[in-house]
Amino acid sequence: MLSTPRTLKCLFVCLAVGIAGVSSARHVRVQEEGESLDGVVDLHVHAGPDSRPRSVSDLEAARGAAEAGMRAILLKNHFTMTADRASLAMDQVEGLEIFGGVVLNRAVGGINPEAVRQMVEFSGNRGRVVWLPTFDAEWYVKNVGEDGAEFVSIMQEGIPVPGVLEVFSVVAEHNLLLATGHSSPEEVIALIPEAKRLGVQRILVTHVFSQGATREQMKQMASENAIMEIDWLAVLNGSRSITDYTMAIQEIGAEFFVMSTDLGQAGNPLHPEGWHAYIGAMREAGISPGDINMMSRRNPARLLGLDPW
């Protein structure tokens, strides 16, 4: 399905703002029957403090995940590093692995290899992920953002900018996970071989449907052993359907996907609630327990360097 800039703008506004009024609780123990969250790993957790309204703090998100039996969460913030926050949360919450990373938006200097190096050096060793630009990505700004807004280029005339290659080298040196942010499918397909050439071992295509990747483009990404994220928020706000996801899973293979929530927006369900609904919807759509386990536990654990579940 082709997406117009207007459609894409609506999609990402929904992703950023969320659906108001779904839940006002700040921290609850989810006690729904049927869908165990034991061992689940969420690679897309938003929480506060943030410059955007969030439903929970880092600590509240971590406590909720631990109480639900989840194995690990990855804290994501579009404008500041989260490795330090993950370390602080780890000191307060038992029974849960908590990781962070850095998004290479303008707030940290854009394509800034030094931001990645400093993240790695922070005490606690919780920095595991580098995201290419998200809200400041060229594709995002031109298709979704405000007219004339600044963006961070990762390619020029079809060639990666030098800073991107240096970032890839730092990612490879420290065996980090590279996530593609809001890069276009064409940029992702061009950059994956460059990252692998420089030694990057693990690549995550950030919510692959949201940037409008076609099925053939997804197959190209899979052929390079990239893992593609499919998030619950896009289904929750109606921009994607479970059928979109299940068709791709059945055609390409569950081994190339990870499920995540991308929740944390004020007014949206809490992360464990999202997981219960997401897993239930996948089961109802005919996805096998084994494939759900692969996409919600095994694949994301491997991407974070954890032992297989």
Question: For the regions a protein language model found, what residue spans apply to each?
Answer:
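Extended substrate/RNA-proximal surfaces in nucleic-acid metabolism proteins
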Residues: L96, G109-L204
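Short acidic/histidine-rich active-site segments
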Residues: D231, A254-H271
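Mid-to-C-terminal alpha-helical segments outside catalytic/metal-binding sites
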Residues: W275-H276, G280-W309
